[in-house]
Amino acid sequence: MRLSFAPLLKTCHNRAISVAQRTGMIEKTFSQQGALGQAIPGFQPRQAQVDMAKAVASAIANQSQLVVEAGTGTGKTFAYLVPALLSGKKVIISTGSKNLQEQLFHRDLPLMVSALGFFGQVALLKGRANYLCLDRLSRQMVE
């Protein structure tokens, strides 16, 4: 049986929600019976991951800054993706490497979008250094 989390997302996007509601949604999402438990075989809730997701959700809601450090295997990616998607706000995620960017956009983000029934828009943005400059190419071909 697959539960739909779309009503949960509509609640987030259509009106301001209380801290208690936001906390409850995050706890439900990260529970064994929640969106992640249903979407990821063998998913095990981790308290550190839930705590981080709540902190990220609070920072987004309060438009404040947050720095989080956590060890390998803590579940950092899902801990920031879930509140980012649930927020209904524009969020920019900057990665430390192109490999992590590719993993995030092509593996983790589609999984979260599917698990949460997210209906918003996501985009992969790259800097100018990632594209061919036709002017430079033509100059190189002449030389």
Question: How should these model regions be labeled?
Answer:
Residues 46-50, 72-78, 94, 102-106, ...:
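Conserved structured core elements
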Residues 4-7, 13, 17-21:
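Short, positively charged and aromatic/hydrophobic N-terminal segments
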